[in-house]
Amino acid sequence: MGLVTCKQEREAELQNRQIDTQIRIENQANKRKIKMLLLGVTDSGKSTIVKQMRVNYLDGFNETEVVNAIFVIRNNIIDAFKNICNIILHSDITVTQEEKVLVKLFAYESGKIELMQEVDELNVINAVSGYECIKQFFERFAFHPMVPDHIHYFYPNLDRIASSNYVPTAEDLIHMRQTTLGVHEISFDYTKHIIRLIDVGGQKTERRKWIHFFEGVTAVMFVCSLASFNQTTEEEPKAFVWESSLNKVQNKVLVRSAGKAKVEKPGLINRLDESVDLFKSIRENSFLKMSNFMLFLNKKDLLTKKLTKVVFSDYFPDYKKWITNDNSDVSVAEFIENMFREGLEPEKRMYAHLTQATVTANIEGTFALCCDVIFGKNYEDTNLE
């Protein structure tokens, strides 16, 4: 009887050890899985960051994506020239009779260009890009609110892009603008962890889907474009009415008073204001109470360039109360960061980073800094349990 009891005890002890081992393995596996949510308003640079992660930690872009990018990039350029030509026709820039034919085609009938045979499409792109009125535009209105950010990269590269043997580079794909619809997820190994990065569309119609991904989120990376301070939301109607100088307050699509948005036309919302409001509403969500928050203040390069032509306080008068006679990128970026921190409870920590999503090394370094915080917090929470 005693031998039977001892055998049963040994078997029970062995079974307990096996269970404990399995629990440790499962706990270790759970530790290694990190769920990150990438959020932000449209055109903030979220998808560009995902592309950089693919370049850094996965296999980059496949052949099909490269081929498809030819058409997407050229459509990016056509859409940009549509806005540019529309602005030109409503400004005091001189347009010759010869130039006016293609300028009006881009401004009012750009859809016809997209339907052209490739050789004809390339001919009109190359022709209009060399016009004197286009050169004047970039000298005077390069940072007009209606000018998409990517054209500052594509325009200097048009000779290469608008050629019949064009093959997009990885850098071209990173600068390419393609609206994120639905949910895009990638997973990759990073040190001893498995990162699950989820990118959800930033358009207003897409945001109702976000809540389905809030549970179990280790970190939220919220992306804001620093250069969006003179832009309005993309989904709202736009009016093409401009004066010839960007420095006049009456030329602004948006007029601000006492730090509050007052719009000339109903429905127009300043994109930076929208980004701040969205961040704060997400920060208060109960599902994300224990999540780390990383703020990516993106497009710092465009902010620097834009501030040489545009006065920040014309859009945010409260900036003058914060600092006087300073339109520098450093001060403006600090002011914008404070907009996000305002009203944030002390115990709710936020880690802010200045980023340039189109530069691979910048995102790689920033992501490493974020992971140092995220992994430490993740292990800390696990140990407390």
UniProtKB/Swiss-Prot annotation:
Query: GO:BP terms for this protein?
Result: adenylate cyclase-modulating G protein-coupled receptor signaling pathway
Provide the Gene Ontology terms for cellular component: axon; cytoplasm; heterotrimeric G-protein complex; neuronal cell body; synapse
In the record, which residues receive a covalent lipid, type N-myristoyl glycine? Answer: G2
Where do we find S-palmitoyl cysteine lipid attachment?
C6
Residues involved in Mg(2+) binding: S47, T180
Database matches in Pfam families: G-alpha
Record region (G1 motif): 35-48
Please tell me where GTP binds in this chain: 40-47, 174-180, 199-203, 298-301, 357
Q: How does it assemble?
A: G proteins are composed of 3 units; alpha, beta and gamma. The alpha chain contains the guanine nucleotide binding site.
Give the record's family classification.
Belongs to the G-alpha family.
Q: What is this protein called?
A: Guanine nucleotide-binding protein alpha-5 subunit
Q: What is the protein's species of origin?
A: Caenorhabditis elegans
